[in-house]
């Protein structure tokens, strides 16, 4: 683990990876980076190579039954997980970033933000030995229906989307309440100065100063955009309303 001092009661992300130097990466910039510096959350990395076996610290081996690629070994992963999870509470999920997992969504991020922290396992090669997932009851989570070379980018996406929900990170709680997915709908269009650009004016209602009409317009826009672009979300939203 990286020797970062522990801050009691602060949300933590612990990452098991072959590339600890990839962190914090973009998480060290902008609002998440400032929040990290201010101690609003913490980041720890575990270098999986440290737990490798043999003179060359091997972390993988060939797939049982044959096939292309390499699979991360269960003995290596088990040792890394045990070390990384030391001192964690019962409210601390262990997640493996995997294309076969549950898709990331806002509800997941809101749930993780209410936890004490999260440990993320970043895979490489052909993935991890299935016995590790079974033994530790690891939850699989996916960034989308595509395959990447490793889980590090997906881990950064998950952390970014969760950290911004932590108290004090954004500064304006309304920002998280009004954005896409928070109400089950996609976000309404946004505009700013100048009032007209390339012959395109800002919609009059947004310049009216009438907060009620602005809210109605934004709601209608959110519903229409969701209905057209994400019929799956729209159906879910309609079903929730009917309940």
UniProtKB/Swiss-Prot annotation:
GO molecular-function terms, A-Z: tRNA (guanine(37)-N1)-methyltransferase activity
Binding locations of S-adenosyl-L-methionine: 123, 143-148
Record key words, sorted: Cytoplasm, Methyltransferase, S-adenosyl-L-methionine, Transferase, tRNA processing
GO cellular component annotations of the record: cytosol
Subcellular location: Cytoplasm
Cytoplasm recorded as keyword: yes
Top-level taxon in the UniProt lineage: Bacteria
InterPro entries per UniProt: Alpha/beta_knot_MTases (IPR029028), tRNA_m1G_MeTrfase_C_sf (IPR023148), tRNA_m1G_MeTrfase_TrmD (IPR002649), tRNA_m1G_MTases_N (IPR029026), tRNA_MeTrfase_TRMD/TRM10 (IPR016009)
Record EC number: 2.1.1.228
Reaction(s) the record says it catalyses: guanosine(37) in tRNA + S-adenosyl-L-methionine = N(1)-methylguanosine(37) in tRNA + S-adenosyl-L-homocysteine + H(+)
A GO biological process held by the record: tRNA N1-guanine methylation
Role this protein plays: Specifically methylates guanosine-37 in various tRNAs.
Quaternary structure and interacting proteins, as annotated: Homodimer.
HAMAP family in the cross-refs: TrmD
Family indicated by similarity: Belongs to the RNA methyltransferase TrmD family.
Matching PANTHER family: TRNA (GUANINE-N(1)-)-METHYLTRANSFERASE
Protein name as catalogued: tRNA (guanine-N(1)-)-methyltransferase
Species whose genome carries this gene: Ruegeria pomeroyi (strain ATCC 700808 / DSM 15171 / DSS-3)
């Amino acid at each position: 683990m990286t020797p970062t001092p522990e801050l009691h009661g602060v949300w933590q992300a612990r990452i098991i990876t072959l590339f600890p130097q990839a962190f914090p990466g973009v998480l060290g910039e902008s609002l998440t980076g400032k929040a990290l510096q201010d101690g609003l959350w913490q980041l720890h990395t575990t270098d999986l190579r440290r737990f490798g076996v043999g003179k060359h610290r091997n972390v993988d081996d060939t797939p049982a039954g044959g096939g292309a690629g390499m699979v991360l070994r269960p003995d290596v992963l088990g040792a890394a997980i045990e070390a990384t999870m030391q001192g964690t509470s019962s409210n601390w999920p262990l997640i493996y970033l995997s294309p076969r997992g549950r898709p990331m969504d806002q509800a997941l991020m809101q749930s993780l933000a209410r936890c004490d922290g999260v440990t993320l396992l970043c895979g490489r090669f052909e993935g991890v030995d299935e016995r590790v997932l079974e033994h530790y009851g690891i939850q699989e989570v996916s960034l989308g229906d595509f395959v990447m070379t490793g889980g590090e980018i997906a881990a950064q996406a998950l952390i970014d989307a969760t950290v911004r929900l932590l108290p004090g990170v954004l500064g304006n709680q309304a920002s998280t309440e009004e954005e896409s997915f928070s109400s089950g709908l996609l976000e309404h269009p946004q505009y700013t100065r100048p009032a007209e650009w390339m012959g395109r004016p800002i919609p009059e209602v947004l310049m009216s100063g009438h907060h009620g009409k602005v809210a109605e317009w934004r709601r209608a826009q959110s519903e229409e955009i969701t209905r057209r672009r994400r019929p799956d979300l729209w159906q879910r939203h309609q079903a929730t309303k009917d309940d």
